[in-house]
Amino acid sequence: MISSAVSSPPRFLNALACKNAAGRPPVWIMRQAGRYLPEYQAIRQKYPLEEMFRNPELIFEITKQPLDIIGVDAAILFADILHIPLALGLDVSFPGKGGPVVFPKIEGGDDLLKIQPKPVEEALSFVKEGIHLLKEEIEVPLIGFCGGPFTVMTYMTGKNVKKWLYSDPESAFALLQTITDQSIAYLKMQVEAGVDAIQIFDSWANLLSRTEFCRFAQPFLKQIVEAIDVPVILFSRASSHFVSEFVALRPDAISFDWTYPLHEIRKRVPGTIAVQGNLDPEILYAPPAVIQQETEKILRSMDGDPRYIVNLGHGVLPDIPVDHVRAFVDTVKNFSPRGTNLGVVQK
């Protein structure tokens, strides 16, 4: 078992319930299990990404690394948002340059016949097995996830996603619905296996205007949020620009990018929805003293908010030094909220 002491119930789940009234806020990091860690790179030298994503023992080991190395308050499952195309009967490869490749490419209505949905329990059984291993070992909450349907469609279709949406909306919406249905089944499998919360990454929603978001993304996200029985966090690189649209979906939490002050954004978010974020990931290139200073600015601005979860405004970048990531996490863990004893580390 990991050695970190854990509150019961964990502060991360308390914050998701908007009830983390005592002590510091919880902290975890998007992409915390990833390329900035030398331990991850050691595994990467031995295995192709396909094997890393689809081997339960490697899923377990990589998911657990940041718990042991940087001491975050929650684990997020090591997986890929393109598991859904696998469950649609497509092939996903990671050639190393230019990002993942989905084959065959789905570029229009005529290509929908290439999609052959499979039961997620069969196609993605390795995810379930990895979750089981983690739940036997870790003492912090485990976050499962999937990609937003629009984002998954973007990867499946390439650069022509909006062309398809406008030129043949009927078939485009059929694909979005198919992705949504498989995503719900996939997340339900994760919940049954033991994850404590879900985050939906609709990363490419920043390609959309507000009107387009309400048409092409929001209805499908709504279906997912309403279908899942554990707390759901929504994230997009455009979340600071889609505050009211995200709030309308009534998730348990919204994770915001760094383009707008979080203490201002929260004024537009009901007190029943937690807020997560939102340090600019590139600040972690700065010296640790600067990282501490910038992190403390956000902590002070959000001090006393029982629904605050500390995170970056996007995933940690692959060339950030581990000590800099640890400086961010340690700053949060050493933060003394109003009414606590100064200098006391609350783990």
Features from the language model and the residues they span:
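A broad, low-specificity signal for short, low-complexity segments enriched in glycine/proline
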Residues: 35-39, 103-106, 215-217, 235-239
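Intrinsic-disorder/low-complexity, polar/charged segments
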Residues: 55, 105-109, 287
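A gly/proline- and charged-residue-enriched helix-loop-helix capping module
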Residues: 97-135
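Metal- and O2-centered redox machinery and metal/ROS homeostasis
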Residues: 2-23, 44, 119, 123, ...
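N-terminal small/glycine-rich loop or linker at the start of catalytic domains
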Residues: 20-51, 81, 86-96, 104-107, ...
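Short, basic, glycine/proline-bearing loop/turn elements
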Residues: 41-53, 108-120, 247
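N-terminal basic, low-complexity leaders that serve as flexible interaction/assembly modules and, when applicable
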Residues: 1-96, 222-223, 322-347
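Active-site loop segments of alpha/beta catalytic cores
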Residues: 123-347
